[in-house]
Amino acid sequence: ASLRRSLPRALNIMREAVIAEVSTQLSEVVGVIERHLEPTLLAVHLYGSAVDGGLKPHSDIDLLVTVTVRLDETTRRALINDLLETSASPGESEILRAVEVTIVVHDDIIPWRYPAKRELQFGEWQRNDILAGIFEPATIDIDLAILLTKAREHSVALVGPAAEELFDPVPEQDLFEALNETLTLWNSPPDWAGDERNVVLTLSRIWYSAVTGRIAPKDVAADWAMERLPAQYQPVILEARQAYLGQEEDRLASRADQLEEFVHYVKGEITKVVGK
């Protein structure tokens, strides 16, 4: 019983330590969000590695922002340009991590319906487009089913109410539909070229979620998948996991055939669970 009591406390201490590690950057990002969105801002939730499993060398700072009304074009551009100053690609800065900000309008997701609409997303992968004056519009985003499930399971409210109070639970069939839809992104080697590690780890997470109905950190899902993989695919996931944790160099691109077989095997296992 004492272990049951002390474990959540230990996890909270760890989580607070991780948040403290990025507190300066976090307060800058939240400051930018508040400055541009203040009158319409309902909530800001920190989710992902920072609060579940700990930040790894290349982990993003993930924020989910909820507002009451759509953003006008002037606000959208000004906000994105200012967020650019608070973020850096992995390995580019000694003090800044990559920031990913997803903005949703309250009435687009509450009550919940699938697929839901995303008002804005900012991430380092958009940097060149943003600098060229290209800004992504609001769009339907199947990933919101996964993102909101993550936020309800593990997040910290930096502004506004707790995620589990604010958001409806995402029905399991919608989560499965989103997971299944994500699988269609990866069919042949060009689909994962340059992003091998992330695709291997994301497939592990999707497999874990399909079987358990829950969402796990990448390294935890990789360990889980490792126990279920045939021996010939284990080196792929082991290398992805070690590279993610910063323990080894990422050489997955040199395992082309093995990698392709791994992707098709895991997709097959996931499809057995979620259909299609």
Where do the language-model regions lie?
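Helical scaffold of the NTase/Pol beta-like nucleotidyltransferase catalytic core
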Residues: L11-H45, T74-R77, G275-K276
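N-terminal amphipathic/basic-hydrophobic helices that include classical n-h-c signal peptides
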Residues: A1-I13
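Extended, basic/helix-rich recognition subdomains
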Residues: F176, N180-E239
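Structured mid-to-C-terminal alpha-helical surface segments
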Residues: R214-K276
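Glycine- and acidic
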Residues: M14-E16, V65, L245-R251
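Conserved NTP/Mg2+-binding pocket subregion across the NTase superfamily
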Residues: M14, V18, N81-A193, V200, ...
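Catalytic metal-binding acidic patch
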Residues: V44-E85, S89, A98-H106
